[in-house]
Amino acid sequence: MTYRLASPADARKVATVLTDAFANYNMYRTVLNSFFTTDSKYIDYLNKLHYVQVMSNIRKGYCLIAEENGEIIAVAVMQSLRHTRITLWDYLRSGAFALWRYVKPTQCFLPFLDKSSEYAKKQTSENRWYLESFVVSPAWQGKHIGGKFLDEAVLPLVAREGGSQLSLVTNTAMNVFFYQKHGFEQIHQTKIGGVDVWTMLVEVKSEK
């Protein structure tokens, strides 16, 4: 398994991995199901949304991928809360116009994500990073890919770039257990719109 930062040429494949991993994630279904009459429209929306997220972070943040024989099998999307500033213009130039048909779900989903991540993105004196998305392709789940990717690539990248903390939000107790096994502590828990939200944090030894 090899690791590298994604390029713009990878964006559609990366977006597909995110959609495949999140399509049946309970949080997504709880927040978004009522807006879609068919699964095909729901998947189309997720692909477009994830493409904008990925392309914006390739340009301004960090999109790290794990590959096996040239296949993208895991993705980590993250930002330095001190240095990364992704603006509305960045989203627009990354394809946000393609979401115009999906105004209502977007108006619901993005505020939900903002509210969910408030505690994780709380500014401190530390150089905190935020892990916005972390997924393993469904075909590769259950093979310890996520743990290796986190320990061998994600945390070392944060350290090399001068980060001293990495925070994230998750919505399942199973994921909380996974992150705790890799050194994260639960620092906050709440419920938003019927969805459980756990905030996790790990200290990172900065190399800068």
What are these regions (language model features)?
Residues 147, 160-163, 172-189, 196:
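Conserved active-site alpha-helix within GNAT-family acetyltransferase domains
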Residues 59-76:
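Conserved beta-hairpin
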Residues 36-60:
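Active-site rim helix/loop that mediates acceptor-substrate recognition in acyltransferases
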Residues 2-29:
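A short beta-loop-alpha structural element at the N-terminal edge
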Residues 122-129, 157-171:
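Conserved GNAT acetyl-CoA-binding A-motif
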Residues 205-208:
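Short, basic, low-complexity termini and linkers enriched in Ser/Thr/Gly/Pro
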